[in-house]
Regions:
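Conserved catalytic breakage-reunion loop centered on the nucleophilic residue
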Residues: 1-195
Length: 195
């Protein structure tokens, strides 16, 4: 455990599987480099979000285009990656997968490790450490997204930007407009009463 801690603090990637959009370099398995195919998908996801698309609309678009989900992409590249999230024969893109990508600061070049730990080597159950105890190395590798775009996306994710099932884009004032009296966010309400 101490060895891993030292490697993490030196900016070495010690996880067996890296974030979608990156791969380990051939010369040093502890360093990350951009995977051109998956990296362009990540950049497209951020662009779609910046254009006002919801996570659900982004996931649907990626599925329509036949783009492999992170799980399927890893499998297609010979990885023995397993996950508990797979529910069907082929794992498709979901709004949860898209949101995880949009929130992951690995895409601005930051390596964040040591989020989980076990009480000791005999106990297999892990728990999430407080964020202050995570090891964060900023500007560790080449980013896929600019800091500015990442920050804008984080602000968008913090707003209520739900859309109706038949709508692809978020309303212009979603998550911004608030009630002048109580300060609650304004939401869309469908009326079924005629008149």
């Amino acid at each position: 455990m101490i060895n891993l801690e030292i490697k993490r603090k030196k900016g070495e990637c010690v996880t067996p599987f890296v974030a979608f959009g990156y791969r380990k370099t051939k010369t040093d398995k502890h360093k990350l480099e951009i995977d051109p195919s998956a990296g362009s998908v990540v950049q497209d996801i951020f662009k779609m979000k910046l254009q006002g698309m919801s996570q659900d609309a982004i996931a649907n678009r990626l599925n329509e285009l036949g783009i492999l989900s992170p799980f399927e992409y890893k499998i297609s590249n010979g990885s023995r990656y397993e996950t508990g999230f797979r529910q069907k024969e082929q794992a498709l893109w979901s709004s949860v997968t898209v949101r995880r990508i949009l929130e992951n600061e690995v895409y601005i070049g930051n390596l964040v490790q040591g989020k989980r730990t076990t009480p000791n080597h005999k106990v297999k159950q892990t728990y999430v450490k407080p964020e202050d105890d995570w090891i964060r190395i900023e500007k560790n590798h080449e980013p896929l997204v600019s800091d500015r775009d990442f920050e804008i996306v984080q602000r968008l994710l913090g707003m209520d930007t739900r859309t109706s099932p038949d709508q692809k884009q978020v309303y212009l004032l979603s998550g911004i407009a608030v009630c002048a009296d109580c300060g609650a966010p304004m939401t869309r309400k469908v009326s079924t009463v005629a008149g």
